[in-house]
Amino acid sequence: MNLLAKLGMGERTRRNFVAILLVAAGGSIIYGLPYFHYDYYEAYAQAYHLTNTQIGVFGSIFGVFGMISYLFGGYLADRVSIRLLLSLSLIGTGLGGFIHLLPLNFPELVALYSFWGFTSLFAFWPCCVKAVRVLSSPEDKGKSFGWFEGARGVASAIMTPLAVIAFRFGMNADGKHDIAGMRQVIVFYSVITVFSGLLVLWKMRDDGSKIDKSEQVTFKDIGTVLRMPAIWIIGLVTFCNYVFTLSVYYFTPLSLIHISEPTRP
């Protein structure tokens, strides 16, 4: 940790640096299962006999449940152990991946994506943000968020090619290429998601994760915040950013539909 000291990080940040990186990795890994079908769109559609519309429903239901969950996740993150919430979110999402290995029909898949919308968004993201704050020294919060976002990117860069290798391994192992490849990808994402949850449970501390009664937010406080113009500007910027980011996920299916035989309308 001498290197971290040379970088000017405080004692608390140095002590919890590994935990911050594990939370960051989990913040990337947990979304592998809900979103992997965009990366393997055609193979996923063929393996599970899905239409383009049905796959679109998965994204919609995941987003709706996530939006509802966000309304309550922050409240829960202030009152329950963030270590426990992060671990349960990761492990629950991973177990959902193992359920995906069963021969599920369309309504059952909709229920699964609804479940993922709850486990990966409900308290997970508010807990990620809070974890970085409580694990960092007061003077290091900006640097810690930088390390957090950077580690998320590194985890994603490592995870994605490994998933491709898993898919390729499945294609070589079975004549039913798409089905076997998809199963290998699901197993890969499920295992690393559960493993990530166990690592967070093992390495993370709960110091300062619960707020005192004097710090609890009231409806009057919420009203005060909502009257701040800066809050609405930040919300608009965030909305525009996510619209662009999520639009990227549709490039793959759209290009496949136009350059190859369509799956089904």
Q: Which sequence ranges carry the predicted segments?
A:
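Juxtamembrane intracellular "pre-TM" segments in multi-pass secondary transporters
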Residues: 2-13, 207-233
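Extracytoplasmic
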Residues: 18-43, 50, 248-253
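Extracytoplasmic gate region of multi-pass secondary transporters
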Residues: 37-39, 230-256, 260
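Central cavity-lining transmembrane alpha-helices of secondary-active solute carriers
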Residues: 60-74
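Cytoplasmic helix-loop-helix junction between adjacent transmembrane helices
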Residues: 115-151
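Glycine-rich segments within core transmembrane alpha-helices of 12-TM secondary carriers
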Residues: 145-168
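C-terminal membrane-cytosol helix-exit motif in multi-pass small-molecule transporters
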Residues: 190-210
